[in-house]
Amino acid sequence: MSTSDFEERVVTVPLRDVSAVPTHERAGRAMTLIREHLAQHFRVDESDIRLDPSLNETVWARGSQNPPSKLRVRAARFDEDGESIVEAEPAE
């Protein structure tokens, strides 16, 4: 695997926009915002982004009504079968 086939970055995803959503939908909307933000920054389709379950647990840790206002995410892009895939997990 050459260096051009693998790229890893730590990205801060702003989640302030979830405050405009009804309270019972905020954590779900935050997950959608994370996926959209990573798709934009890695220039891939949203369906090519795989979110780690620990990222889901981090967003939902304070309940569905109070997700974090921003989140640091470690994302890695690699080529799989000629297609770019992005895997994301919370950065520590």
From Swiss-Prot:
Give the GO biological process terms.
cytoplasmic translation
In terms of SMART domains, this protein maps to: Ribosomal_L31e
Q: Which GO terms describe its cellular component?
A: cytosolic large ribosomal subunit
Q: Which UniProt keywords apply?
A: Ribonucleoprotein, Ribosomal protein
- Tell me a Gene Ontology molecular-function term this record carries: structural constituent of ribosome
Fetch the Pfam families from UniProt.
Ribosomal_L31e
Fetch the SUPFAM superfamilies from UniProt: Ribosomal protein L31e
InterPro entries named in the record:
Ribosomal_eL31 (IPR000054), Ribosomal_eL31_CS (IPR020052), Ribosomal_eL31_dom_sf (IPR023621)
Top-level taxonomic group: Archaea
| Family as reported in the entry's similarity comment | Belongs to the eukaryotic ribosomal protein eL31 family.
What HAMAP family does the entry give? Answer: Ribosomal_eL31
Official protein name in the record: Large ribosomal subunit protein eL31
What is the species of this protein? Haloquadratum walsbyi (strain DSM 16790 / HBSQ001)
Q: Which gene encodes it?
A: rpl31e
